[in-house]
Amino acid sequence: MPADHNPSIKTSHGVLHLIPVGLGEAPISAWLPPDAQILAGQLSTYIAENAKTARAFLKLTPLTRPLQDITIHELNPRLDDATLQTWLAPLRSGVSIGLVSEAGCPAVADPGARAVAIAHQWGVAVKPWVGPSSILLGLMASGLDGQRFAFHGYAPVEAGERVKQLKAWELSSAKQHQTQMLIETPYRNQAMFTSLIEHLKGSTRLCLARALTTNDEWVRTLTVAQWKSQPIPQLDKFPTLFLFQAAA
């Protein structure tokens, strides 16, 4: 429903624009539509997961003002709600604001979801723009169930708890015919891969989606039993999405 016909949307307010950021070194033309590039270059205020990467992103857009004149608030999970509401307050005066993640789509596995929730509480229009999402791209390329899936973020760091959690997710996958997705800090990727092939069932299908949209992109899905007979893939230093689906 158009904003001007939706009584819950206040047309005197600005718009919270959810603008994706690239996952790697590909040119901006490969992952962000021209209209979104133009819009991104026009906004004067941003809320970002990481101010440094937000500035790097903005340098790729057709800026209409000097970069130093753009306000960038850095959002982290520990930020109090009162401060976040203060940053978003210009929306209620008709000023539009951009929301960006460190990489990929904002507000998906990202603290920016808090800003979106506040915008909805205030009746502010929220505009999501098309762009890269490692979760969606990895799922697309995996060949696993794309209708029932769950993204869990990080598994526990402690070895015993990690194994317990992986087995619980595998059981859930088998019962619900559901793809399970998780990530790890790049320097722990090799250890995570080892945990997966050591503790998941041999019939479980496991996909590695490494460095999506970059020159080092590599995606492969095999059963756990098949992975055990393969050379160990190089995963350290590369953002990697792990996906698996257990046999019913």
Question: What annotation goes with each model-predicted range?
Answer:
Residues H17, R114-S172:
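Class I SAM-dependent methyltransferase SAM-binding "motif I" and its flanking Rossmann-like core
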Residues D81-V126:
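Glycine/small-residue-rich loop that forms an oxyanion/phosphate-binding "nest" at active or ligand-binding sites
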Residues H73-D80, A155-A159:
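Conserved helicase motor
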Residues A40-Y46, G123-K127, T179-Q180:
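Short active-site oxyanion
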Residues A48, G98-P106, T179-E184:
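Acidic beta-strand-to-loop metal/phosphate-binding motif
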Residues P2-H17, T71, V95-S96, A174-A248:
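A contiguous loop/helix-start segment that scaffolds small-molecule binding in enzyme catalytic cores
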Residues P2-L75:
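Glycine-rich, flexible N-terminal cofactor/catalytic loop recognition
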Residues K52-A54, G104-C105, S134, R188:
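Alpha-helix capping/helix-boundary segments
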